[in-house]
Each structure stands twice: as C-alpha cells, then as structure tokens.
UniProtKB/Swiss-Prot annotation:
Name the record gives this protein: Large ribosomal subunit protein uL14
Quaternary structure, from the entry: Part of the 50S ribosomal subunit. Forms a cluster with proteins L3 and L19. In the 70S ribosome, L14 and L19 interact and together make contacts with the 16S rRNA in bridges B5 and B8.
Family statement: Belongs to the universal ribosomal protein uL14 family.
Function: Binds to 23S rRNA. Forms part of two intersubunit bridges in the 70S ribosome.
GO molecular function (one): structural constituent of ribosome
InterPro entries: Ribosomal_uL14, Ribosomal_uL14_bac-type, Ribosomal_uL14_CS, Ribosomal_uL14_sf
CDD domains on file: Ribosomal_uL14
Organism of provenance: Alkaliphilus oremlandii (strain OhILAs)
PANTHER family: 50S/60S RIBOSOMAL PROTEIN L14/L23 (PTHR11761), LARGE RIBOSOMAL SUBUNIT PROTEIN UL14M (PTHR11761:SF3)
Keywords for the protein's UniProt record, in alphabetical order: Ribonucleoprotein, Ribosomal protein, RNA-binding, rRNA-binding
Gene3D superfamilies assigned to the protein according to its UniProt record, in alphabetical order: Ribosomal protein L14 (2.40.150.20)
GO aspect biological process, one term: translation
Length: 122
C-alpha cells in the first residue's frame, strides 16, 4: 500500500533513484495505491545526466509493493521493496529499461510496454 509521503525506488533507467508519493490518482478521497495504480511523485534523488531531474514532479506506476497482494486464484504475491516506473501522460515509460521483476497485474491494467521490457514477470 502506497500512500502520501511514501518513498519508492525507481525501477527504470530514467535517471531518478528515489520518488516521494504526492498523490494517489483515481478518486477524490483515495488513500492507497496498489500494484498497477498511477501516482504523482516528486523526484527526491537522481543521477547526473539523466532525463529526470531532482525536484521534478512526475507520474509513475507502482510495479512492486511490500504489502501482500491477493490474486484471483487465491495466491498472494509480495516483494522486498516498493518500486515504481516513471511514465509519460500516454502511459508509456520514460526509460528504456526496467530493472527487477514486475507483477502480472500490470498486464491487466494495459501497461504492456512495461511488461515487455521487464526481465521477469511474476
């Protein structure tokens, strides 16, 4: 569960390293974001020479959460860290590579480019 002020690692090569969640999109009083949800973030740390700079406000999609997620078949999935991928307004990733595994729920939410770039889909 990602909420306001949550910090996330960046799972792509856009240049950002850490994000701070500012807002969870999808409703006026929505509190939590889960895997596949879009959030508005501020870049807290970035690598020099990257596409994204520190202090920039970006949209990102959550790809890994430490909270357990229940699937339709009754199984649960849980990751070691909270991570997100920075996206543009047309839901395409800013970076050209994705690091680490991503959840299968992204395919249901139509983030096909992220799923195809990921080295492993769990």
């Amino acid at each position: 569960m990602i909420q306001q002020e949550s910090r996330l690692k960046v799972a792509d090569n856009s240049g950002a390293k850490e994000l701070l969640c500012i807002r969870v999109l999808g409703g006026t009083r929505r509190k939590y974001a889960h895997i596949g949800d879009v959030i508005v973030c501020s870049v807290k740390s970035a690598t020099p020479g990257g596409v994204v700079k520190k202090g920039q406000v970006v949209k990102a999609v959550v790809v890994r959460t430490t909270n357990t997620t229940r699937r339709k078949d009754g199984s649960y999935i849980k990751f070691d860290e909270n991570a997100a991928v920075i996206i543009k307004d047309d839901k395409q990733p800013t970076g050209t590579r994705i690091f680490g595994p991503v959840a299968r729920e992204l395919r249901d939410k139509n983030f096909m480019k992220i799923v195809s770039l990921a080295p492993e889909v769990l």
